[in-house]
């Protein structure tokens, strides 16, 4: 292997001698003494008589490359270094400069208008999730419906006192709620009467509907059907039925109606 072959095949002689050259400073610091030292050091393991490599061809190639690298750098180091700098270090410097420019551009890149719009839409979605009490984990597929499972704010208004035939399963709140749903009475147990232990044949439970409209519908059902289920001995509202009844229709004041609907042609009828 001669100098021409090295240049044509882009052979890094310093790598063969295990000398790391990353820039011009490293290249200029490589002395003939260091080259000689590395050659003697590697000869202890790469010489055919001392190598542990079982493949003789590999052993011979490694030894020939080491000898060639030492000889060329001993005789033509100045010429080789000029070529090495232009071939390896120049390309490395260009790559480093491109990398630095790219990294700097990423840091200085301003957020585009489209990205700002995405952030704004994401913020709007989060606000909707909070408003409708939807778990944040569902943000990709939100269903904007209000949570009706929470405790009704008008619990006392929508409360019923219910006397039931005394059965073991009715003492279990979860089972009793399931039973109410099964017989199409949309109410949720709030608490049991403290006197149930003293009752022999019946028990009293207090349950509420989820809103006033549902409460009115239940009251109308009671009025029409009289009996909801044989096990329900009494079903009475905590608030008298009359409080939900409006026998007279009163037209809302036009000025107030226009404020609410922003139109005097669409008044509220009570």
UniProtKB/Swiss-Prot annotation:
Which GO terms of type biological process are on file?
mRNA processing; RNA splicing
Q: Which domain of life is it from?
A: Eukaryota
What does the similarity note say? Belongs to the DnaJ family.
Q: What does this protein do?
A: Involved in pre-mRNA splicing. May be involved in endoplasmic reticulum-associated protein degradation (ERAD) and required for growth at low and high temperatures.
Q: SUPFAM superfamilies in the record, alphabetically?
A: Chaperone J-domain (SSF46565)
Is Cytoplasm among this UniProt entry's keywords? yes
| A Pfam cross-reference name | DnaJ
J domain mapped to chain residues: 12-84
Q: How does it assemble?
A: Associated with the spliceosome.
Spell out where the chain crosses the membrane. none
**Compartments in which it is found:** Cytoplasm; Nucleus
For this UniProt record, give its keywords in alphabetical order, as a comma-separated list: Chaperone, Cytoplasm, mRNA processing, mRNA splicing, Nucleus, Spliceosome
The answer to whether UniProt assigns keyword tRNA processing to this entry is: no
InterPro entries recorded: DnaJ_domain, J_dom_sf
GO CC terms of this entry: cytoplasm; spliceosomal complex
State the name under which the record lists this protein: Pre-mRNA-splicing factor CWC23
| Coiled-coil residues | none
């Amino acid at each position: 292997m001669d100098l021409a072959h090295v240049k044509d095949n882009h052979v890094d002689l310093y790598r063969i001698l295990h000398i790391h050259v990353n820039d011009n400073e490293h290249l200029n610091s490589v002395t003939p003494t260091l080259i000689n030292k590395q050659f003697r050091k590697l000869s202890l393991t790469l010489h055919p008589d001392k190598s542990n490599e079982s493949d003789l061809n590999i052993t011979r190639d490694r030894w020939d490359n080491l000898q060639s690298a030492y000889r060329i750098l001993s005789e033509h180091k100045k010429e080789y270094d000029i070529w090495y700098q232009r071939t390896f270090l120049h390309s490395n410097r260009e790559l480093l400069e491109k990398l630095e420019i790219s990294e700097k551009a990423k840091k200085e890149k301003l957020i585009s208008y489209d990205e700002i719009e995405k952030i704004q839409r994401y913020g709007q979605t989060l606000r909707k999730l909070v408003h409708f009490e939807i778990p944040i984990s569902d943000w990709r597929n939100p269903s904007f419906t209000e949570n009706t499972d929470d405790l009704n704010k008008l619990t006392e208004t929508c409360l019923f006192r219910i006397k039931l035939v005394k059965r073991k399963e009715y003492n279990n709140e979860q089972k009793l709620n399931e039973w109410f749903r099964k017989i199409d009475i949309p109410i949720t147990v709030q608490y049991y009467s403290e006197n149930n232990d003293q009752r022999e044949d019946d028990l009293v439970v207090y349950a509420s509907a989820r809103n006033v409209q549902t409460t009115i519908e239940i009251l109308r059902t009671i009025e029409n059907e009289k009996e909801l289920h044989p096990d329900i001995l009494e079903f009475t509202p905590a608030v008298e039925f009359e409080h939900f009844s409006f026998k007279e229709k009163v037209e809302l004041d036009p000025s107030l109606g226009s404020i609410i609907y922003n139109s005097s042609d669409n008044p509220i009828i009570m």
